[in-house]
């Protein structure tokens, strides 16, 4: 068997969609499972939709997700777009500039598999409108199919605008096998004479993708199932050239919880948005692998190495995979819990600084306490702001906490705690861990009277995270201010 070579071939028309990342991931995992190569090609033949900076952004998101191409378009160490590999250029517009497609379109025309079409947009619109009115499938009516190459070249020399179309045979069945969907057959009577070269000289997706996949030695074409209806045209082009047809793998669509296709209008779909919220790349990879696929042992938490070992297309579902944010949160929460507190603190800091909760010079030891306090509660990093809000906003006691202000030994308890806190320069973890035992020993107060009364005064609530850590985060002066407020009630 020849080396497995797969490619992810996005268009630089905007942000990387979460469904696109899943397609890239499945390509990557299949390549790694089979000791093959994962290529990245940029398909930018539709220049009207090109977005400046989209290539850099796309490569950055893939790099973040750990999906580094073995070949094709990559980012160098300085963040510049470059290429690695022997089959370049890997950006289609650069391939056009080198004239790579010309010999192949000339071959199709010479063999009678393609023809020049001079129909105007206005005429094409009229034909399609009439077909719709007659209840027919809108497609090109073949007016220019009979124009000879000689006549066509004369018209081109006279300055007439043209495109080049694929000349499909009539009533021919084209069958191909899909690794997920099985055998699929289309009849050419239900297909259109696809434009292969546009009036601007650029190849269309349908022509370029076949030429590029062949020249780059792609063995498995792994893409979304929205391309199934176009695949018969691609198979016919392979047959016209006499090339081996690669294996096709059309992935089920990613759906929202309503069963509709994920859309940027109604759903969070941009990878950059998940990244900004603080989802971890290992969680995103783990979860996306499960959107339409399951491992044989039904394991759900899997590292990239485990995914590489277990992934195959025979367990990919035929129906759409539902993107369930709650399950993503559950998986992300698992990975957050695995992070060391010191590292997690540095990861949480940008969110707290950006939201104005803390300053850049906020003490590291307090950040570590915050990480320790809330790591079990976070679905994603950006949630940290609302989780810690009660520690930083203006101090206020809720009604349940106020009940403890009536405790008969409140003054004795608070004065004992105040005395201990005033004896240190700052509340650090070691002090906080032992201070309540000292207060208990000094006052004889224990249990609920000790702990819940102190919590009510220090936090303004009767429930919440570890009291020791809260005192560290609040700091000496803030804790004393809250104690004094209770004493001066």
Curated annotation (Swiss-Prot):
MF-aspect GO terms: ATP binding; glutamate-tRNA ligase activity; tRNA binding; zinc ion binding
Keyword annotations: Aminoacyl-tRNA synthetase, ATP-binding, Cytoplasm, Ligase, Nucleotide-binding, Protein biosynthesis
Locus of motif 'KMSKS' region: 261-265
Binding-site positions, ATP: 264
InterPro entries: aa-tRNA-synth_I_cd-bd, aa-tRNA-synth_I_codon-bd_sub2, aa-tRNA-synth_I_CS, aa_tRNA-synth_I_cd-bd_sf, Glu-tRNA-ligase_bac/mito, Glu/Gln-tRNA-synth, Glu/Gln-tRNA-synth_Ib_cat-dom, GluQ/Sye
Subunit text: Monomer.
Protein name: Glutamate--tRNA ligase
Organism placement in taxonomy: Bacteria, Bacillati, Bacillota, Tissierellia, Tissierellales
């Amino acid at each position: 068997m020849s080396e497995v070579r797969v490619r992810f071939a996005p268009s630089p028309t905007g942000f990387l969609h979460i469904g696109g990342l899943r397609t890239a991931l499945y390509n990557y995992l299949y390549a790694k499972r089979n000791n093959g190569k994962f290529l990245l090609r940029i398909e930018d033949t539709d220049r009207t939709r090109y977005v400046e900076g989209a290539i850099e952004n796309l490569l950055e998101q893939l790099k973040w997700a750990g999906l580094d191409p073995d070949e094709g378009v990559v980012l160098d160490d300085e963040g510049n777009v470059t290429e690695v590999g022997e089959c370049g250029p890997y950006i289609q517009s650069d391939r056009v500039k080198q004239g790579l497609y010309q010999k192949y379109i000339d071959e199709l025309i010479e063999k009678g598999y393609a023809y020049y079409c001079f129909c105007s947009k206005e005429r094409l619109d009229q034909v399609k409108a009439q077909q719709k009115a007659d209840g027919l499938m809108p497609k090109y009516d073949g007016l220019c199919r009979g124009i000879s190459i000689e006549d066509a070249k004369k018209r081109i020399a006279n300055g007439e605008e043209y495109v080049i179309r694929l000349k499909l045979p009539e009533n021919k069945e084209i069958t191909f096998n899909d690794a997920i969907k099985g055998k699929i057959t289309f009849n050419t009577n239900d297909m259109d004479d696809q434009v292969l070269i546009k009036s601007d000289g650029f190849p269309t997706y349908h022509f370029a993708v076949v030429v590029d996949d062949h020249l780059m030695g792609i063995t498995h074409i792994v893409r979304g199932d929205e391309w199934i209806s176009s695949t018969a045209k691609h198979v016919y082009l392979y047959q016209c050239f006499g090339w081996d047809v690669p294996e096709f793998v059309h992935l089920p669509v990613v759906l929202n919880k309503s069963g509709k296709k994920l859309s940027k209008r109604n759903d969070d779909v941009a990878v950059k948005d998940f990244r900004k919220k603080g989802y971890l790349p290992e969680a995103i990879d783990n979860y996306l692998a499960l959107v339409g696929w399951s491992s044989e042992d039904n394991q759900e938490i899997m590292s990239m190495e485990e995914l590489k070992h277990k992934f195959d297309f025979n367990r990919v579902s035929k129906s759409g995979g539902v993107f369930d944010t709650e399950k993503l949160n559950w998986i992300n929460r698992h990975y957050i819990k695995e992070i060391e507190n010191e590292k997690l603190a540095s990861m949480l800091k940008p969110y707290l600084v950006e939201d104005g909760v803390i300053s850049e010079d906020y003490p590291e030891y307090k950040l570590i306490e915050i990480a320790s306090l809330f790591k079990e509660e976070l679905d994603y990093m950006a949630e940290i702001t609302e989780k810690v809000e009660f520690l930083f906003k203006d101090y206020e006691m809720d009604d349940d906490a106020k009940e403890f202000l009536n405790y008969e030994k409140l003054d004795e308890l608070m004065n004992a705690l105040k005395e201990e806190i005033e004896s240190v320069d700052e509340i650090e973890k070691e002090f906080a861990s032992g201070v309540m035992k000292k207060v208990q020993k000094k006052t004889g107060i224990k249990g609920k009277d000790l702990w819940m009364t102190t919590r009510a005064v220090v936090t303004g609530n009767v429930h919440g995270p570890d009291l020791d850590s809260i005192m560290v985060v609040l700091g000496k002066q803030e804790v004393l201010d809250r104690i004094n407020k209770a004493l001066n009630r």
